[in-house]
Regions:
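Active-site neighborhood of glycoside hydrolase catalytic domains
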Residues: 390-392, 430-586, 598, 603, ...
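Polysaccharide-binding surfaces and accessory modules of carbohydrate-active proteins
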Residues: 10-13, 17, 21, 31-261, ...
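Extended acidic/polar, glycine-enriched regions
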Residues: 171, 263-314
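C-terminal beta-strand-rich structural cap/linker in extracellular carbohydrate-active enzymes
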Residues: 699-728
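Short Pro-Gly-centered flexible turn/kink motifs
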Residues: 97-105, 281-300, 718-725
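Carbohydrate-binding surface patches
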Residues: 231, 240, 641-684
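Conserved, mostly hydrophobic/aromatic
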Residues: 18, 162, 286, 332, ...
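Aromatic-lined carbohydrate-binding/catalytic grooves of carbohydrate-active enzymes
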Residues: 323-460, 473
Length: 728
């Protein structure tokens, strides 16, 4: 069994293949964190809770309990009763007083895992996952708090979530509810997180853990370009293969916080959940509230082991799409080719040329509906513009299908333009504060998805289009953050529920979409902003960044691949000079970098120089050859140009280590230097490998210890693939 309970010791032990998590109970019923680390083969003990040391437990010291609470490693700390570190749960009662104290009541252990109502969450069979639910109660508030732990043994993952229920007769206010907490002794930890901006998302940053609080967060209504719902604590010197890592990743697409607090007694508290700013939930008598899920990973073998745990877990237990283990079509998107300036003839020209070179799908991006000839109108008016799309959408789709390509289409269902028929008819459907001039971003407002009729309208607009033609792919976009938080639908006491209700509404729409169109390939897109595990639950891939420059993408994709499988990262070959940074890179390098993702094209193939055009059939053949390895294989980070400023290298190995694909990018050339010798990863040290295209044979242990020579590189931004295949 993955989960054990020792009644005499009052201990829960949660085991994966390589890790153990231990929870203990104090005599009073406080739920404490005992241990998280390498697998324990015997019974654990309670002594790490330090209950036999001053200030002792409240039942022993017979005095005030605050000194105990402020030191005790709480499994789920509550606010207002004497623990002055960051709390996870703040409850205000009907009299306006804030305070909550929970005590152990009961537990349940069962095989499998229950879904989280209205939320994305991991899943697994009874053979793959086991769950512990610890029920706690606050007898004063008549509040039930259920702490849920699901153990995915093979992937070395533990997921956590919390739900609360008001069993009293008076309404309560949930002013803060985080999903997970980890209390530990400090071991000179450093904090690792992902930061960025539009066009440079998910850059890795790492620094010393200072006394006080350090955090990442979003208050924008999305997981955001700027910070990411992921935090890891690492021991000094941690690299890809060595060091301890404690990581949390939030399965949610709205406001979040991930915080680490180094406390006065040199302990560390790491918490993660919904950002409490502009959040308050009315919990009426009998009501429940379900908090989203956190995915926790511990690695004793550096960041690489953590990465591969997350990759395997998300592929097996988060992505539901039939495309998860299926070849995805090579698409060409017309956005950077045409922007808004296109019509049926132009799209068909692109389709004909794309077909010649092995491309399999045409995606029509923004500008096909309403009066949408630039970005200042028509969002919400999802009616085909037949001045552009002559003969209607079905006519276009049928002609693209006749050419031999599948067809995809772009939507931005959550938005509304001030200049739209929809806004003129229903201005109250936009999120805004009455009497205040609303903030426009990209000439648009955000629809109030807390309103059921708005969800229904937006969904039916999308579904009606999909029912009308043979459409195989949808790009679901979101190009602005939320502001001016006001809903004419919610009453005054529920306005602070709007952020969360918005996210729930978006989830409900996407759930309807994949239920009605189960074979649809859905790609979520927010210019790289709303890239989070919650969206993976609905779509197997997410657009990684609007910056398609191959060199910029190295750092973006390195940070993204730290926790997300390559098959989830939307990546395309685009034109040069690049539309974002103006850089010129070899077409081959652009293809190699895009191959470390979903692979596609974002360009006008009808205008491409011949020397680049002739490379497309080679690239599409490359994708067909390696797509399964990249989608299903194990990822190894070898070199980071972020760190060395010279070169980038990664590998993808099959699970049985029978083949390894290595990608090397020389970012900047260096004068008067010999070939670079790089210690590779991902090989079986006992096997021998032939380098494809040569007669060269290498042992796995030599490649990983002595290294492989990267030779015959000339110039900046050049790259090469090396495919190693095991030989008998």
């Amino acid at each position: 069994m993955a989960i054990l309970y020792y009644d005499e010791k009052k201990l829960f032990q949660l085991n994966t293949e390589n890790t153990t998590y231990v929870i203990g109970l104090s005599p009073e019923g406080y739920v404490g964190h005992v241990y998280y680390g390498p697998l324990l083969h015997g019974e654990p003990d309670l002594y790490p809770l330090r209950m036999d040391e001053p200030p002792f437990t409240p039942s022993v010291n017979k005095r005030e309990k605050s000194s105990f609470l402020d030191r005790f490693p709480m499994e789920y700390p509550t606010g207002g009763v004497g623990d002055y570190r960051e709390s996870c749960l703040n409850i205000r009662n009907a009299q306006g007083r804030m305070g909550c104290e929970i005590f152990f009541d009961s537990y349940e252990i069962f095989k499998g895992k229950r879904p989280l109502t209205g939320l994305p969450a991991s899943f697994g069979t009874e053979d793959e996952v086991e769950t512990l639910e610890i029920t706690c109660k606050d007898p004063v508030l008549d509040l039930v708090v259920v702490l849920s732990y699901s153990v995915f043994t093979k992937e070395n993952v533990i997921t956590r979530s919390v739900r609360v229920k008001n069993e009293g007769s008076e309404a309560l206010k949930v002013e803060k509810i985080y999903s997970a907490c980890l209390d530990m002794d400090n071991e000179d930890f450093e904090m690792l997180s992902l930061h960025g901006s539009w066009g440079r998302e998910r850059h890795i940053q790492q620094g010393a853990l200072r006394y006080g609080k350090q955090l990442v967060s979003s208050g924008k209504g999305e997981s955001s370009h700027q910070e990411h719902p992921f935090v890891a604590l690492v021991t000094p010197g941690t690299d890809q293969e060595r060091g301890e890592v404690y990581a949390m990743h939030f399965v949610y697409s709205g406001n979040f916080i991930g915080q680490v607090e180094r406390c006065q007694f040199d302990t560390v508290r790491m918490v993660m959940g919904i950002n409490q700013e502009e959040f308050c939930w009315n919990l009426k008598a009998g009501d429940e509230f379900q908090a989203p899920e956190v995915v926790m990973v511990y690695s004793a073998e550096g960041l690489g082991k953590m990465t591969r745990s997350y990759h395997a877990f998300y592929r097996r237990h988060m992505i539901r799409s039939p495309y998860n283990h299926k070849k995805r079509p090579i698409l060409i998107n017309n956005w950077e080719a045409t922007y808004f300036d296109f019509d049926t003839d132009k799209l068909l020209d692109i389709a004909r040329e794309a077909k010649k070179d092995g491309i399999e799908m045409l995606v029509m991006d923004d500008g096909w509906f309403g009066k949408r000839n630039k970005d200042d109108s028509s969002l919400g008016d999802w009616v085909v513009n037949e001045e552009k799309i002559k003969g209607g959408l079905k006519n276009l789709v049928d002609k693209v299908n006749e050419i031999g390509l599948e067809f995809g289409i772009w939507f931005e269902p959550e938005m509304i333009s001030p200049d739209s028929d929809l806004y003129r008819e229903h201005p109250e459907w936009a999120i805004q504060i009455p009497g205040r001039e609303a903030t426009e971003i990209r000439c648009q407002y955000v629809l109030d998805l807390s309103r059921p009729e708005v969800q229904d309208y937006a969904y039916e607009c999308v579904a009606k289009i999909l029912r009308s033609a043979n459409i195989k792919y949808v790009k679901w976009d979101m190009n602005r953050q939320l502001s001016d938080l006001g809903s004419t639908y919610l009453d005054k006491d529920s306005q602070q529920e709007l952020f969360h209700r918005y996210v729930l509404g978006m989830y409900a729409m996407q759930e309807r979409l994949i239920q009605e169109f189960p074979d649809l390939l859905l790609e979520n897109c927010s210019g790289g902003a709303r890239f989070d595990p919650g969206m993976l639950y609905y779509s197997p891939q997410i657009w990684c960044s609007d910056d398609t420059d191959a060199i910029e993408r190295l750092e973006i994709q390195e940070g993204t691949a730290l926790i997300y499988p390559l098959c989830s990262m939307g990546a395309h070959v685009s034109v040069c000079p690049n539309h974002t940074v103006g850089r010129v890179t070899p077409f081959t390098t652009r293809g190699h970098v895009a191959l470390a993702g979903t692979f596609g094209y974002e360009l006008d193939i009808t205008k491409l120089p011949e020397e680049e055009r002739k490379l497309i059939p080679e690239q599409t053949a490359m994708y067909h050859k390696y797509h399964e390895l990249i989608r299903e294989g194990e990822y190894y980070r070898i070199l980071s140009s972020r760190e060395n400023h010279r070169s980038d290298c990664w590998a993808v190995a099959s699970e049985d280590k029978s083949e390894v694909l290595v990608t090397y990018v020389q970012v900047l050339a260096q004068a008067n230097m010999p070939s670079r010798k790089v210690r590779l990863r991902g090989f079986d040290p006992a096997k021998k490998y032939r380098l494809e295209g040569t007669d060269e044979v290498y042992s796995g242990e030599m490649l990983m210890n002595a290294g492989f020579r990267m030779k015959d590189f000339w110039g900046d931004f050049v790259s090469r693939l090396y495919h190693f295949v095991a030989v008998d």
